[in-house]
């Protein structure tokens, strides 16, 4: 299957000054919410958030659902380092190209780390942050000690992922694997076949805990106590260091709060966004 034929909606494309071409969905009108997905094989903005952003459209928000470089319909260069600075620069470039002056960043896992990184780099751009089990608050070795990360990297490096292998990876993301329809697995398998091997081997995200005090914007966070990818102890890293943060911690919940507790997630986010 060619990238043109991926089972994902086609939205808009922007080419950055670097030549990198990024894909994004632009849905709704109003204050801007930027959706930043995580780093799982085959991920895209749509596959991560298709159960969430429609409620934000209905509530009067403009939603920029981005495919990060290396994912979805965006470019997937095989000759670069997929480190945090690269991702932050790419998202910043896209927002500048779209003349976004102010926005809320909403990020899951790697996307949460990017949201923190961009919030530190360009604080004037950020109105609020919504973080779901964000990366960037532990050392790399801590994340790679988690069974979810270990198995994900092992299966990705072993060769092309099929539906069964993708189901194994994605089941580790959730407490209740019944939330995994075959259509979602098929979307991710199709994207994963185009992803370069350097994507995960060069993915370096620093521990930003000591800089969280610089984030002077309201933060709403979510974390599942059964997270197999990012340790739930990260909650206290954010609460102890960021000046204005609150978290919803859920038991019987894995790495994908927005999927396993969709209604609670959508409602809580919208209440947070609509607060003065």
Where are the model-predicted features located?
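Conserved HGGG/HGGXW glycine-rich cap/lid loop of the alpha/beta-hydrolase fold
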Residues: 16, 20-73
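Active-site loop/oxyanion-hole signature of alpha/beta-hydrolase fold enzymes
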Residues: 25, 58, 65-106, 267-270
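Conserved alpha/beta-hydrolase catalytic His-Asp/Glu region
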Residues: 145, 159-216
